[in-house]
């Protein structure tokens, strides 16, 4: 074997090595572009909040708040809402959007995914899904919560995690079967339909690098018969409202959609609309609870 031939073989092996590394790393780089965690404190801890540390299934320590109903004992609340936030900030940034819920006689549980706020770890698709499941399990086992009256509120990316946590991936080779016990209603606010679709909107072709098993469009049909409410602003500058139209078409009954004229991203429960969409959510929850 000549020296020149040896060099060609080494060069070919090196190129092959680079290709393998890229195939392995690029999907991880692409999905990490979805997450913008920080530990900045955007406001004081709510006075009524119980600060919680709970453990994900893989041992990661996660931080949450339990804010009881403003009316009487928590176990007698209309429901307990588990809030699953989006891909940026932490729960202190999202608190103003849901601070009204305890005044409607519901308990509220908020938590931060791994790597967000005071929670340990590093974000990943599977990690955030496991964190969401662990949060639901934690609330189910609280002595002061009625485990048969749970509501999931997923905002933006949180909607994908909610649906993946209580649904299973339709069309996937290895389907996940999730525990839907006690989940009486699901509310999705400004949720994108799939990781690949939103990635392709940002960088054409990048969606092929992502794992869509955790995407809303793969899981929404399988959460039936849990009622689903979908809200989205028609002027959302982050996620097109058409994503929610697609999700509504895929969802099974019972389902409801509300499109907010000129509404922006996760805008439904902001102060812009007073109680209009807050009332709609509470009415939806009460209807879902009365169905059984």
Curated annotation (Swiss-Prot):
It is a single-pass membrane protein. Disulfide bonds: none annotated. It is found in: Membrane. Keywords: Membrane, Transmembrane, Transmembrane helix. It comes from the Bacteria. GO terms for cellular component: membrane. Belongs to the serine esterase family. The keyword Transmembrane helix applies. InterPro entries: AB_hydrolase_fold, Hydrolase_4. Its main location: membrane. The keyword Membrane applies. It comes from Salmonella typhi. The chain crosses the membrane at residues 13-35. This is Uncharacterized protein YfhR.
